[in-house]
């Protein structure tokens, strides 16, 4: 299986490129893609850029140009639920948009028109990564991740998201868009995020301090998953 891997920022990608076997750089539409393998699994890595549009574009390129058979998103996120600490990993069982509102047409808040409210990760991938995580010294959680084109850094914003999604575990800026694009193209997907901050008023300071470590932890979980696919 050839897997496309998307990270939004260089800090979220660097640990993966350092652990890529037989890496090669390929330029497509002005962006750099890294091909190679992890164990016996063929992969294509890309730094998409931040936000929903850039990440969804990368899904399309990975599918069309590189013919990947699955998509995995890795990187950092802000923790929203009690009991989730900076450094913990959250695996998205499902994802939703926290900034979409077409309720005037009868859709649920967060539901894009003509789309489901939730985008569910591939069940086989979830089962496999749970097995991997049981063997790693890494605190992890499985649940809902919310996506929007905002960096969440305040209690009022947290409260707003939780009003609509009380079971949300973490928030970030790409996952649901990647999931929607992958689902539209018939590709199984998985989203792995390590917590860089708590999305509160100190989030920007915490993010700057912990983004590299969050990227590394998320990548470590992903690498263990890929090697187990051998």
Language model segments and positions:
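Short loop/turn motifs at secondary-structure junctions
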Residues: 2, 67, 85, 141, ...
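Conserved catalytic block of serine-dependent lipid acyl chemistry
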Residues: 75, 173-185, 217-219, 226
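Metabolite-binding pocket within alpha/beta catalytic cores that recognizes anionic/polar moieties
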Residues: 1-123, 127, 132
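Active-site rim beta-loop-alpha module in soluble metabolic enzymes
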Residues: 105-170, 177, 181, 185
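Zn-dependent metallopeptidase/amidohydrolase metal-coordination segment
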Residues: 178-209
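Glycine-rich beta-alpha junction loops
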Residues: 9, 78, 95, 147-150, ...
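His/Asp/Glu-rich mid-to-C-terminal helical/loop segments that flank catalytic regions of hydrolases
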Residues: 200-230
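Active-site-proximal beta-strand elements of phosphoester/diester hydrolases
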Residues: 44-48, 146, 192
């Amino acid at each position: 299986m050839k897997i496309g891997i998307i990270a939004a920022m260089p800090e979220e990608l660097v640990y993966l490129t350092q652990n890529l076997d037989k890496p090669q750089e390929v330029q497509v539409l002005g962006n750099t893609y890294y091909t190679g393998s992890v164990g016996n699994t063929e992969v294509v890595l890309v730094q998409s850029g931040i936000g929903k549009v850039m990440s969804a574009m990368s899904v399309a390129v990975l599918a069309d140009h590189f013919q990947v058979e699955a998509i995995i998103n890795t990187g950092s996120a802000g923790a929203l639920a009690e009991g989730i600490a900076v450094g913990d990993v959250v695996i998205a069982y499902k994802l939703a948009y926290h900034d979409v509102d077409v309720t005037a047409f009868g859709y649920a808040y967060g539901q894009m028109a003509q789309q489901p409210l939730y985008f569910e990760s591939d069940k086989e991938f979830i089962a496999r990564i749970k097995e991997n995580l049981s063997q790693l010294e890494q605190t992890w959680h499985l649940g809902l991740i919310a996506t929007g084109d905002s960096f969440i850094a305040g209690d009022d914003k947290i409260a707003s998201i939780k009003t609509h999604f009380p079971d949300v575990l973490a928030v970030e800026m790409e996952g649901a868009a990647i999931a929607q694009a992958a689902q539209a193209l018939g590709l199984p997907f998985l989203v792995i995020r390590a917590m860089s901050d708590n999305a509160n008023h100190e989030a920007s300071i915490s993010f700057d301090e912990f983004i590299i470590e969050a990227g590394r932890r998320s990548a470590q979980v992903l690498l263990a998953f890929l090697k187990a696919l051998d």
